[in-house]
Every structure is written in structure tokens, then in C-alpha cells.
Amino acid sequence: MDSLYNNNYSYGEFIDPRDGQKYRTIVEKPGWVSVPEFEAFAQNLNYGVQIKLDATEFDDSKVEKYCYDDDPWYCDNGYGGLYSWSEAMGLPKACDSVWTGTTPACPDSIFPGWKYEEEWRDLMIQGACPEGWHVMNETEWRALRGMDKSLNGHALISKVSAGLKSSANGTGFSALFGGMTELPTQYVRIEDLGVYHLPLEHEAERHKSVTMSNQTDISYRGVHYKKDGLSVRCVKDY
């Protein structure tokens, strides 16, 4: 696990009181007026009960996650869990199929002013993150990207995923390419793609995300189906 990180940085540690898991954390200092600094997990979230890719019954009283190839090794060795959007946002499973706040099965909107899309950038939604932390939002992702002097996104990516690129993990953020699920049939693109949830709806069944790879720069507001399993990073509330 030590190979995932940048040894030139001093990492903190957070113990999730819900299950005792330990996460390395890092204080990023982008220097933005709106986000001068923030503390983030330097690992993908790995909280919840593992379910199989072909699962058809779900329990809204628990956080449920996928592990790549249905193998818990991936969850437990830095790649973390893969979560549907509803699980990542702490919402009922029905919210993967409708706009939040529009049906009795998904009664609570994560942001009542959803028509004003720019206002979603700063949302702090706890979701599957521990109390006092929230799912990393678009403003935080953009601020972190602004710290990348390589201008290609590699400074956010662990050398385990970025290979021998000299700019890899210059921010200490240590992103891994954990792949994703394309429900209902397959896990895809491990070690090729890292896709992270944003608290931002796009359509009834789709949402916006952050995508990174070795081939392209970071893409903000990519569109994925809410049912697809993606990674989550948590940021401490401020």
C-alpha cells in the first residue's frame, strides 16, 4: 500500500468510526479564494457491505458497494468500493432512476435549486462518507486540478496507475484507476480509468462525474448512468 503514495508528503490518518478502517489523508492547498485549503482522503472510500454485480435485491438501510470483479481484494487494497450514485449520496436505491425529490420512493432532493446547475459545484453532501466529511464536489476537484503544474492531470494520479511519468502524484492525492461497473453485466477498465461521483444530477437516470486516465486530461461533468458503480473521495467539512 505504501507504493500508492508520494513519500515527499506528510499524510494524516483518519479512522472511520463506523467500521474501524484507516485512511490516509492529505491537506491540499490550492489557494483559491473559495477553497484556500482542504483535507481529503488520499484513498478511495471503502465503506459498506459488498454486493455482487448481479444483485437484484438491495437494502436501503445499509451502504452497499461493489468490488471490482466481485473480488474483495480490490476494495481492500486501495481501489476502494464502487458505488451507484444513490449509494454514494446516501439516498434510496430508487433515486438511481428518477430525479431526486420527485417521487415518494425518492422524496428528498439533494439540492432543491437544481435548475441552477452552477450552484451544485459547492454542495457538501455527506452521502457514504463518515460524519463530518462529504463527497468531493466539483469546486474541490477543479481547485485540486489547478495545483497540477504538469497540465495533464498526472499530478493527481498515483504512480501505481500513472506508471513512470515524472509528474505522477505531485499533489499527493494518489488517485487510482479503479475502473467501474457497467450494469448489469460487467466490470470494465481497471487500471485504465478512474471515475468519481459528483453530487450533480444530469437527468432522471444519469449524473455528472469526474473522469481521469493516462490518455486524456481530467474530464469534469462526464455523464454516467446513476446505476453504474464509480469511486468516491471524501473531503473534511469546512
Regions found by a protein language model. Give the residues of each.
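Conserved positions within compact, well-structured domain cores
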Residues: 1-238
